[in-house]
Amino acid sequence: MELLQIQNVKKVYTTKLGLTQCVALKNISFTVQEGEFMAIMGASGSGKTTLLNIIASLDRPTAGQIFLNGTPFSSVRDRDLAKFRRENLGFVFQEFNLLDTFSIRDNILLPLVLSQVPVKEMEARLQPVAKMLDITTLLDKFPYEVSGGEKQRAAVARAVITDPQIILADEPTGALDSRSSVELLQNFARLNREVGCTILMVTHSAMAASYASRVLFIKDGEIFAQLYRGDGDNRAFFDRIVSNLSVLSEGGADVG
């Protein structure tokens, strides 16, 4: 089932005086299936972060439509956007965005507190998520007492505890060492495989993208190519991704 639909999305930024325009996205169209793990790649300035911000409802497109499970984003009033994001979207950022004055437990539960979920239900949701992400022993610690990889696992727990329709991850391995990056990506793959989480991840890393089932390449605000994993393993998919990135940098056609 198509969970997310991006239809002819265009984004144009105009200077205050209206003298200069910058086209960040040019008629982008694609869909994300429910239960899919998809990565978006592209060079700096390609438009991938702009696209993610629009999908996250943090920005509005100049033209085009976005639908989440059939609901057009354009129908959500500005004053209702925070509630819409909290109920439908989970976020994982490069810099964790945990509150240092809150324990790991309280950071994870914060979205549920804002939604006024009963305490018993919050605890019932927390335990299986903490167990899956191996952070049960960290719940009473504070962010400054744990490692970067552990912080990011807590951030993932915060993203999934609301049972969002889709998880949006922006360079989630960018602040992690190689070991923590692999652990995080394995957790993403497990959440996708065992829980059915739909994940859309923006990344510069071919290694990170190799954990996805599909990779979309963006260049100069347009879709350049896409790759499907198929039956190959991570290593084979990584090699194909690197080949496409090479062609992308040279401006050639999709090599498949």
List the predicted regions and their residue ranges.
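Conserved beta-strand-loop-alpha-helix hinge in the C-terminal portion
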Residues: 222-247
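Short acidic DE-rich linear segments
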Residues: 255-256
